UniProtKB/Swiss-Prot annotation:
It is found in: Virion; Host endoplasmic reticulum lumen. Belongs to the rotavirus VP7 family. Glycans are attached at N69, N145. It comes from the Viruses. InterPro entries: VP7 (IPR001963), VP7_1 (IPR042207), VP7_2 (IPR042210). This is Outer capsid glycoprotein VP7. Its main location: virion. GO terms for cellular component: host cell endoplasmic reticulum lumen; T=13 icosahedral viral capsid; viral outer capsid. Disulfide bonds join C82-C135, C165-C249, C191-C244, C196-C207. N-glycosylated.
Length: 326
């Protein structure tokens, strides 16, 4: 009996000593690995000359678009400003160094060289199909064109607000808008939109669901269409899907890092009448039409007042981000 107890105690002591030895061995081994790893980290960096791809990107958001006057020297920048302008401005100025001149003028207003990026677009129609707003602050210059009033106002509504959008299958389903913030947004080379409102028996109201020629045409061959119909009523839609994509969208609120400046025009575009616009003070302003040199001088002169009406955001906007906001 006593022999069994002694054997048990002896076995326990041997197990304890063996476990203690194993733990000490593991501790010594881990200390060796950790200290060797730290030694390598401390010694190697001064000997290497590799690029750190994380510090030379002054623009927040997507970097898919190359910017004409980008620089990799200003790694300390905390804010970036993108200035969007039509191609006609470049043609009129006709000066290969005009961007450098404007950049130096922005420097006098506190914007370091390399923090201002110039982005050219062909026209309002093409810009509305694929808006790309990547900077902390984005200022879009739109020269007034009487024939493009609708495109200009809808583009302003698109880029001055954030939207959550989902695909629509108009061949299988009827759609209705739930409230005033719910819109259908179409983009493409040519968008013609027709709608047929339905009653509770899914019969057309003033139209035949089997005959699209009886549908109400709300847009014809446009690049960008924001369709607003009567809330709470199902609609059958007919869209030129071969050249246009339509999405079911919800306006979430203002995109406060974007401002639109209308250049010239007797009529002032104003989207603040939209009841879904909150707050009612929008970042949309107008300056008188002058030569493009004078336009850029005016923007430089008032850039800081313009920025004060905006808020810095890191979320970028392009056609993909517009469709699927994350």
């Amino acid at each position: 009996m006593y022999g069994i107890e002694y054997t048990t105690v002896l076995t326990f002591l041997i197990s304890f000593i063996l476990l203690n030895y194993i733990l000490k061995s593991l501790t010594i081994m881990m200390d060796f690995i950790i200290y060797r790893f730290l030694f390598i980290i401390v010694v190697l960096p001064p000997l290497l000359n590799a690029q750190n791809y994380g510090i030379n990107l002054p623009i927040t958001g997507s970097m898919d678009t190359a910017y004409a006057n980008s620089t990799q020297e200003e790694t300390f920048l905390t804010s970036t400003l993108c200035l969007y302008y039509p191609t006609e401005a470049v043609a009129e100025i006709n000066d290969n160094s005009w961007k450098d001149t404007i950049s130096q003028l922005f420097l006098t207003k506190g914007w370091p060289t390399g923090s201002v990026y110039f982005k050219e677009y062909t026209d309002i129609a093409s810009f509305s199909v694929d808006p790309q707003l990547y900077c902390d602050y984005n200022v879009v210059l739109m020269k007034y064109n009487e024939t493009l009033q609708l495109d200009m106002s809808e583009l302003a509504d698109l880029i001055l607000n954030e939207w959550l959008c989902n695909p629509m299958d108009i061949n299988l389903y009827y759609y209705q808008q739930t409230d005033e913030a719910n819109k259908w947004i179409s983009m493409g080379s040519s968008c013609t939109i027709k709608v047929c409102p339905l009653n509770t028996q899914t019969l057309g109201i003033g139209c035949l669901t089997t005959d699209t020629t009886t549908f109400e045409e709300v847009a014809t061959a446009e690049k960008l269409v924001i369709t607003d119909v009567v809330d709470g009523v199902n609609h059958k839609l007919d869209v030129t899907t071969s050249t246009c994509t339509i999405r079911n969208c919800k306006k979430l609120g203002p995109r406060e890092n974007v401002a639109v400046i209308q250049i010239g025009g007797s009529d002032i575009l104003d989207i603040t009448a939209d009841p879904t616009t909150a707050p009612q003070t929008e970042r949309m302003m107008r300056i008188n039409w002058k030569k493009w040199w004078q336009v850029f001088y005016t923007v430089v002169d008032y850039v800081n007042q313009i920025i004060q009406a905006m808020s810095k955001r890191s979320r970028s906007l392009n056609s993909a981000a517009f469709y699927y906001r994350v």
